[in-house]
Amino acid sequence: MVRSFPSDGWSALPTRFGFWPENPTTAGVVSSRVFSARLPEVCRQVHDKQPFGMFKGENGMNYTFSTFLIEAILIIFFIKIVYVLLRPLRQPRIVCEIIGGMMIGPSMLGRNRNFNYYLFPPIANYICANIGLMGFFYFFFLTAAKTDVAEIFKAPRKHKYIAAVSVLVPIACVGSTGAALKHKMDIRLQKPSSIGGVTFALGFTSFPVIYTVLRDMNLLNSEIGKFAMSVTLLGDMVGVYVLVLFEAMAQADGGGGAYSVIWFLISAAIMAACLLLVVKRSFEWIVAKTPEGGLVNQNYIVNILMGVLVSCFLTDMFGMAIAVGPIWLGLVVPHGPPLGSTLAIRSETFVNEFLMPFSFALVGQKTNVNLISKETWPKQISPLIYMSIVGFVTKFVSSTGAALFFKVPTRDSLTLGLMMNLRGQIDILLYLHWIDKQMVGLPGYSVMVLYAIVVTGVTAPLISFLYDPTRPYRSSKRRTIQHTPQNTETGLVLAVTDHDTFSGLITFLDFAYPTKTSPFSVFAIQLVELEGRAQPLFIAHDKKREEEYEEEEEPAERMGSRRVDQVQSAFKLYQEKRSECVTMHAYTAHASKHNMYQNICELALTKKTAFILLPYQKERLQDAALTELRDSGMLSVNADVLAHTPCSVCIYYEKGRLKNAMVRSSMDPQHTTNSSHMRQEMYRFVVLFLGGADNREALHLADRMTENPFINLTVIRFLAHNHEGEDEREKKLDDGVVTWFWVKNESNARVSYKEVVVKNGAETLAAIQAMNVNDYDLWITGRREGINPKILEGLSTWSEDHQLGVIGDTVAGSVFASEGSVLVVQQQVRNQMGGDGFLNGKFDYKKLVSPWSHSHN
C-alpha cells in the first residue's frame, strides 16, 4: 500500500514531471489516489529505459532509481554527521537520527525549492516513505524478539506497584486535562479516540525506547537500568492491549458502528490465537531442529522475516496500528540462542544502519515547524502542549515518588523518573499513525516530534549527570591482599569466558596455595555475551534449586545454556576436589561486552573480596606479523575492571610450561587439603619489584606462594641510582614491606632476594634481559602505581598494552622471548570520599533486586 499522509493547506506542487493534478489525465503518468478524495495524489512518470550516461547528454537525476540512490546517500550522511556533532553532548542516537531526518524535511533544507526539485521530488519520496515504514516494522520485531516476556511474572512485587503508579497517575491526569480542553481542540482532536490515543501515548513508556537509549548510554547492565526496563516492560504488556482498545474506539468514531468494532476485536483475537498456538510452536520446532551451538537454517530466517511483512499486512487490513503485528510476532520468538540470536546476527545491522535512516527521513519529511503559527496554535497545538507538560510532570513525580516510597535511594529514584519520560521510535511511529487516522494534523504532529526531541535530548544528559553506574564500585574500605589478615579466608572473584581460561586461572590458584587455615572463597563468574535478548541475565547457581530450575527452563533457554554447561561442570568438579580449602560459588552473567565489568565489580563489592583474577586473552597469530593480534573480547572487559574495581586486580597471562598444565597438589602432607596433586616438579617464580602500591601488593601475593614446597621464588628489587626520582613516602612503605618479607622468609631456602641499581629504563630492561629468562615459569610484577618514573624512563613509548603496565607488557611480549607466564597486579584504589547515600549514588543492593537475578543450580 502506498501511504500518503494529509497535508494542511495542500495545493498542486510543480515538479520536474509536471504537477500533482486533482484529476491527472496526462499520457505517460500513472496516478494513484489513496485514502480519500481530500488527500494529494501520488503521480509517477513511467520510464521504459535507464539513462545511457552523462556523456550521452542525459541527466541521471531525471530517473527514479538514480534519485533514490542520491536520497539514500544524503539521508545516511546527514544522520551520521548529526550523530558525530551531538555525541559529545551525550545525546542518544535516537535524538540525532530524528534531527538528521528533519534536515532534509521542510523544517530545514527542504524549504529550498531547488533542493526538493533535484534531490527529493515526490516521485522518489514515496519509495523512501515505504522503506522507512519497513524499517520501523523490522526494528520493533527485532526488539520484541529479544524481550523475555516470562520476566513479567518473575518481577518483584515492588516493580509491579511502581509500574502501575507510573502509568495510571499520568493517564488519569492527562485524560482529565484533555477532557477539560476538549472544547478548545481541533475537530479531529476532539474525538474520544483521539484524546484517548494521546493520553495513552503520554502515559506509557515503551520498552523498545528504554532499551535503545540505555544501550546507547551503556546502562543496560546497571541496577537502575534493569529496574527501568522491568517497570516499562510491565507497562508495555498492558499498553499493547490498551492500544487495541483505542483502535476499536477509532473504528466506532470512523462511522463503522458496533458491527465494525466487534469484527475488529474478533480479528485481533484470532490473530493473537494463531500466533500463540501455531506460530510460537513452529518457532519452538525450529529451535529443537537446530544443532547445538549452530545457527538457524537460512531458509527459516528468510521465512520469518517475510512473516513480519505478513503480520504488517494483516494488522493493517484489520485496521489496527500497523506496528502491532511485528511486535506480537516478535514476542512469540524464543529469545536468546539459537533463534533470537541468529535473527539479530543476520538482520540487525541492515535494519539499524540502512532501513532505519529512511524511517527517520519519513519522520523528517512530515515534520514542519513552519506550520506552528498563530493560526494553528489555539486548537491544534496548545492542547497537545498542555497535555504533554502534564504528562511529563505527572510521570516524573509518580515514578520518583513511588520509588522513594519503596526505599529506593534518592538519586536512583530521580534517575528512574527521568528514564520513564524518554521518547523514541515507537512514539514517533504512533504520531505518524495519528496522521493516518486523522487524529491530528501536521502542526500537531510536528509539535509532538519536537516534544520527543526536547524531552529525550534533555533527560538523557541529566541521567548521565545524576547516575554514574561506576561510582558505587569504589570503596573507602581496604580490600587488598596486603591488608587481608593471615590465616583467614581470602575472597576473590574469578572471571572466565570458557573452559580454557578457567583451567589456566585454577592452575594459578593452586600455586597461590589455599590451605585449611588460609582458605579461598572463590566467586567464579562465567561471562557470556548477550545475544538475541534485550535484558541482561545474572544467574546465581544454587545447588538447592538445580532441579527446580532445569524443570522451569524454556526450550530456547536450554539450548543457550548448553554452551556454559562445560564450565559449570568444571566449577562443580573443582569444588568437590578442593572442598576443604576452597569454597566455590558459581555465577553466569549474560551481558554485552561493554557492561560485563559491572557484573564483575558488583560481585566483588557485595562479596567484599580482596582481589579479582582476570585472564589475559590476547595472542599473536601464528606466522603473522607482530602487529596482528587476536582479541577474544576480554581486553575491553579487563580495561573497564581496572578502571572501576572496588578491590585489587590480578591479570594472568598463561603460556609456556604452565599453559595447560594439569592441576595437582604439591603440598606437604601436613597441609594437604584435597586429593588432587600438582605435578611433582619444581617451579621457579620471579617477582620484579619496582616499588609502589601495585608492587607491594604483588609481593604479598607472592608471599602466599612461598608456603608451597615446590615453588622457588626470586625477588628482584630495582632501585634508582643515587635515589633519583624517589618519593620519600613510597620509599618508606616499600622498605617496610620488603623488610617484612625478608624477615618472614629468611630461613626459607627456596626464597632468594636481590637488589639491582639502575639509572634509567634502558638499564632496567637490560637487567631483566640479562637474567636467564627461560629459567622462570612465572613473572610477577606490579602494574604501575607508585613506580619511580626514573626506573621506567624511556620504556613507556615502547609499551603496546597498558593493561599489563610497562614491565608486564615487556616480559609478555614476543620480543622478550620468555616462555614464562605473566601475572600483573594492581592494588585497590580507595575512594577517598567514602560514605554512602545521596552524594555518591550508593546502590541499595538488598532492596533494589533485579528481576533478572535468579538463583538456581
From Swiss-Prot:
Localization of this protein: Membrane
Highest taxon in the source lineage: Eukaryota
Cross-referenced InterPro entries: Cation/H_exchanger_TM (IPR006153), CPA2_transporter (IPR050794), Na+/solute_symporter_sf (IPR038770)
Gene3D superfamilies, sorted: 1.20.1530.20
UniProtKB keywords: Antiport, Ion transport, Membrane, Phosphoprotein, Potassium, Potassium transport, Transmembrane, Transmembrane helix, Transport
Family: Belongs to the monovalent cation:proton antiporter 2 (CPA2) transporter (TC 2.A.37) family. CHX (TC 2.A.37.4) subfamily.
Name the UniProt record assigns to this protein: Cation/H(+) antiporter 25
